[in-house]
Amino acid sequence: MTRSREAMLRLFRVGDNRAAATVPKPAIFPGYVAPIVRKAADGERELVNLNWGFVLLQKERAPKRVTNVRDDKILTSPFWTPSFQQRRCLVPASSYCEPKGEKPASWHWFAVNGEEERPLFAFPGVWTRYRGPLKKNGPNVDQEVFAFMTTEPNALTASINHERMPVLISDPADFETWLSGSTEDAFKLARSYAAEQMRIVQFGADREDLLRVA
C-alpha cells in the first residue's frame, strides 16, 4: 500500500474522525497490521488497522495464518461463512505481487490501469476477532484479523501464477455492495479482474513495491 491515508479516506469515503493512523508501506506481510475499511456499529464506514491472516488451530501442530479465502469456499466453509455473512471489509491496495519460479523467485507486481501511477483499489475481504495462541503452547492473544478473497486468475495473472489471483474491485458502487449488500449480491463480485485493465509494473527479486506514491 504505497498510497497515503488521505487518498484512502477520499476513495473509500471515510471521515477523518473515523480513521486510525496509518502510513504508506512498500509491502504488507502475513501477521502484520494493515488498514481495512468496514462498517462500524452505527453503520458508518471506518478505517482501522487489523492483523492480516485468520488463525486456524490445528491438532498437534502450531496454529496457522490463513491469509486468503477461496471464492469456492466462502459460502460453504464454517471457517469463513459466518464472517462473509456478517463481517465483510475492504482491504485498500495499490499493487500486489505474485512469485514466478523459485530459488530465487521473481516477484511480479500488478496494478490496475488508471490516470495515476498506482490507482487505489480494494480486495474484498472478511474480518473476525481471534482469541487464542499464535504458536503451539503459546500465550493467548486477542486480535482482530482479516483475510481477502481469491478466484480463478485472468490471462495476465495466469502467465505468472496459474492457480489463483485476488479478487479486485475499484468501483465505489461495488465497495458499498460488498460492505452492505446481500450475500448473493456480494458474492457476484467474486470474479477475476479484466486482464486488459491491469498491468505488471515491476518484477525482480524485491518483495516491496519500490514506487513511492502520495
Q: Which role fits each region the language model picked out?
A:
Residues 1-214:
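Short linear sequence motif anchored by a di-proline
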